[in-house]
Amino acid sequence: GIYGKTKREAEIKLLEIGYHSGMHVSIVRPSLVYGPGVKGNLQLMQAGIESGWFPPLPEVNNRRSMIHVDDLVQALILVAEDDRANGEIYIATDGESYSSRQIYEAFCSVVNKAIPQWSVPKVIFDIVSLMSSRMRYKVNKLLGDECYSSKKLQSLGFKAQRSLREMNETDF
């Protein structure tokens, strides 16, 4: 879409400015960030699970990349300090991938809610996605794939210290 296109154009411009000025410029694209102070869809999911209105997600075997905010900070420091990173683009993940159901279950555990043994059937989400392009977008954000490789970042020596499986109540 237009957002992705303009973001990419801005990245290219920044890299060009860095190259021509001799300034160290690197781009870090974080995957879905979780941890203290993080806002957005994960915060909404957590609040919905806590209050009991978030639907139990089906296991659709999708894959999503994530990174803890503390690990993202370490990745940013590494890229800023390592001369090899100059002029490069990196993707920051914890190196694992999770299904939306696994994310849902991790949040249930963090807020001390029993993990339901049932889920809303995927066909219900499929029907909802037919209602409008906005609903299709929301369902895809929830159940679609967003899985990326951080091998390039790892080549600088980055290794995430946290994973979603170790998430606890101090992460929110």
Regions of interest found by a model, annotated:
Residues 78, 82-138, 169-172:
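Mid/C-terminal beta-alpha module of Rossmann-like enzyme folds, strongest
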Residues 2-6, 30, 65-69:
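The catalytic Tyr-centered alpha-helix of NAD(P)H-dependent dehydrogenases
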Residues 137-172:
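C-terminal amphipathic/interface module of NAD(P)-dependent oxidoreductases
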Residues 69, 100, 160-161:
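Amphipathic alpha-helical segment in the mid-to-C-terminal domain
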Residues 23-43:
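Flexible, glycine-rich beta-alpha linker
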Residues 44-69, 114-147:
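Alpha-helical membrane-targeting segments
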Residues 1-26:
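Active-site Tyr-X1-5-Lys
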Residues 38-44, 58-80, 87-88:
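Substrate-positioning beta->alpha
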